[in-house]
Amino acid sequence: VLTDDAKHAIIIDAGMYEEHEQQRFAAYIQQEQLTPIALLITHAHPDHVCGQTFVEQTYNLDAIIQPDEGQLDIPYFNIHVIASPGHKEDAVCYHLPDENILFTGDTLFQESIGRTDLPGGDMDTLIRSLKRVIMLPNNTQVYPGHGYPTTIEHEKQYNPYL
């Protein structure tokens, strides 16, 4: 969940498998007094979309899935979509240049990359996507769909796939 000072919230991926996870998520939104305004999906694998219906129905949102590359029209946030196929053909990253943040889903992880052995995966395509992603400023904070945050600079130095 990404928030601004006015407590508007963008939800990135809705990987809530079970009801207790959904309840915990809803409690967090309520406790922090957040107002969800968008649900962004990085790619349509179950671990990123299984809570999509819950989020859509609970907060009256329509998920943004596989948007066109370019600027997203979402109030309060400057979000740029970067197409990043390879792990899955519909994969995208969400870059927030004003905050220097990148949400990568399963495209880029700390010192690793997304799998390409699943349907829709292709290593050559993923490598091309990664070459575009690492062109972002070195101090860009990277938030992958799994694991720990990292930076573009760290990945350029230590990721064996780059």
Spell out what each predicted region is.
Residues 9-11, 39, 63, 78, ...:
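Hydrophobic "anchor" residues on beta-strands that sit immediately upstream
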Residues 1, 71-97:
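Core dinuclear metal-dependent hydrolase active-site scaffold
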Residues 1-27, 32, 93-105:
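Conserved beta-strand hairpin/beta-sheet module of binuclear metal-dependent hydrolase folds
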